[in-house]
Amino acid sequence: MGISIKGLNKAYFSEGNKIRALADVDLTIPANQIFTLLGPSGCGKTTLLRCIVGLETPDSGEIAIGGETVWSSERGIFVPPEKRGLNMVFQTYAIWPHMNVFDNVAYPLQARKEPKKDIIQKVKKTLQFVQLEGFENRPATKLSGGQQQRVALARALVAEPKVILFDEPLSNLDAKLREETRKELRDFLTTLKITAVYVTHDRVEALALSDLIAVMKDGRIIEIGVPKKIYFDSDHRFVADFIGRANLIDGTVRAVDDSYAIIDSSIGAIACPESPDTSPGNKVSLCIRPEFIRVMADDTPQKRNIFRGKVESLVFVGEAYEGEILIEDTRLFTKIEPTARVEAGDEITLFFDPDHCFVLSK
């Protein structure tokens, strides 16, 4: 079930100042997809989520879920949260410590006064789905973080909602468990073919979970795209920098040669794929991800995108070294294989993959 948002505005007043949490947001969330709202703290993503579920009242605009308007300032429509057919998984899970797993999951059905036989059947089916069969009588206080997250998911699923909304549900888990749980969560949601709206500030989480990502800043949607498009070929400088470590280099288009634009920059000429923004004379910004800057042998023949630089620092992070390289007066970030014989202070030869040097249009 899809969600349509038109002209949504929400402002707060703090210490006499007006803060626009949402500024004329227009957004269409497709049915049966995992749609992530990604952005830094204070960008408006949680406010937008709370407006969708009905926990916040917008100042103006319209929200429709499955074609039914649930909020409209112009037409005076407000459908209360409990009648919107939504469920929400919070950051804290909100698992009741005095209840066992069965009672936690069954609570939404008990609140609707469904027949006991139906409740038992639905809870059993849902616990099987989230791989918690046999945990029915386990006290909530005896569950691991990952198990609590699955109980919260089961409680959201058992009522068969039209849409599930997630407000940073993995942020309290340790790194390893977070990786395992986000894979499980994607598998669950993909199998169910349910519409999910997911809020996070974690870019890796967004890339791993999502079918579509909307990047927000200052109450506005800056860019929407599939994860690979957002990461490898984003349009906006802010998005390119936020979604992952990026080397941003300004320059001027000198010429276009054999489908590649030649950009004059502070470190020299850089070749990148031709695009509508690479007309000769145009001033452009290039984005080059660290993983597409490779260390080469010192005797590598001169060709496009070969540069010499000095290693300023190296940090070992397990699967690679994260290096800071100085080329002329420009500091760049790169990833270097852990087996490479490179040390801080070395002069090295670098190659920028031309097919992964992309021009930012905004």
Predicted regions and their residues:
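Conserved ABC transporter NBD signature motif
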Residues: 61-73
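Helix-to-loop junction immediately C-terminal to a conserved catalytic motif
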Residues: 53
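ABC ATPase nucleotide-binding domains
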Residues: 85-87, 91, 95-238
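Glycine/charge-rich catalytic "coupling/switch" loops of P-loop NTPases
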Residues: 232, 260, 265-312, 339-362
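ABC ATPase nucleotide-binding domain
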Residues: 4, 28, 64, 349-351
